[in-house]
Structures are given as C-alpha cells and as structure tokens.
Regions:
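Active-site-proximal specificity loops/subdomain of glycosyltransferases
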Residues: 1-47
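Alpha-helix N-cap/loop-to-helix initiation residues
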Residues: 22, 54-55
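Catalytic-site signature of metal-activated, phosphate-bearing donor transferases
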Residues: 27-34, 55-178
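The conserved acidic donor/metal-binding loop of glycosyltransferases
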Residues: 49-53
Length: 178
C-alpha cells in the first residue's frame, strides 16, 4: 500500500531491507537507508519507512514544495502516528525530503537513533530547514496484532541494546518487557 502512494510522486522507488535480519545491531537502519540514498538517481530522496504514507491529494503540493525549496538540504514534515481509525497523535517533525542534487554528501547517521540526516557531520535540524504542513501518516500499529507489535518491539530493543549497551526506554528484549 505504501509503495503505491509513492509511485505518483517518485521517478524511482528503491526498496531496501527485504532481507532484514531477525537479529541485528541498531546502526543497521542507518546503513540501509544510506545505501538507498546513495543508489538513488533523483534530485530529491524521501527517506520513508514502509508504514509512512502521503495522501494522494498532497502530491501536487509536495511537488511545489520541492521546487520552492530547491536550495535547502532537507524539508521537514509533521508525522502523525495512527493507532486506530479514531486515535492518533502528532509524533514528531522529521526531515524526510533530502536534496541529493544540491547536497549529495548527506549521510543518514545522526540523532539518537542514528538514522537522521547529517551534513558535514552535523545533524540537519528540523528548525534549520523549511517545515511544511503536509503530514506524513505512519500506520505502523494499525495493521499489526498486539503480538506482532510486541515481538518486533522486543527485537528492536535487543538491537538497541547491542548498539548502546542498554535498553533505553524500550523495556527489554522479550515481548513481555518490550
């Protein structure tokens, strides 16, 4: 479903992570996002998870925004996390549109989770780039059972622990703790 929403906007879609390992270290996310960025041929690269969606009606606005801010290294979008059809939250603002044409040296290795864009070793801050009012919708929890969510959260907690030596705010390495 998510891939379909990108087709009207994108010249190409690079799909990564099909052979995602069951157990991994947290920095794996940034490495595969970077591989996709590096292999992309377009002027702009959207760093999108498979559960991120644009609404079709927003695609013409997104195209105009990309043209308007063609000298910016990134564009930040508000991200809405959808839990159920009637329950959601504004999760964050995130730099998802990355200007590869003007800034091919962007890396996806920043922030606390090591996947946010950096330029010359410095995090591209949401406050330093254009912020648009076109939301990205994250439907992660909507399409999965509680059991699958718990299993995935435990797997991600173990990856975090391998990277940083603790579980942080992720609970623990079992579905019951995560």
């Amino acid at each position: 479903q998510a891939l379909n929403c990108y087709e009207d906007l994108a010249d190409e879609i690079n799909i990564i992570g099909q052979k995602f390992p069951e157990e991994f270290k947290w920095d794996y996310f940034g490495k595969i996002f970077q591989d996709a960025f590096n292999s992309s041929k377009g002027d702009w690269v959207f760093r999108m998870d498979v559960d991120y969606f644009f609404h079709e009606k927003d695609i013409p606005k997104i195209r105009r925004i990309l043209n308007k801010y063609s000298t910016s290294p990134a564009i930040a979008f508000p991200q809405y996390q959808i839990f159920t059809p009637d329950r959601y939250q504004l999760k964050t603002k995130i730099c998802l549109a990355l200007n590869k044409k003007e800034f091919p040296e962007i890396k996806l290795n920043g922030g606390g989770d090591l996947v946010l864009p950096t330029l010359n070793g410095k995090l591209i801050e949401v406050s330093d780039v254009p912020n648009v009012k076109i939301p990205i919708y994250q439907y992660d929890s909507t399409f999965r059972t509680k059991e699958i969510i718990a299993k995935d959260r435990a797997r991600f907690a173990r990856a975090w622990e391998r990277q940083f030596g603790n579980f942080g705010n992720r609970g623990g390495g079992t579905p019951e703790l995560a």
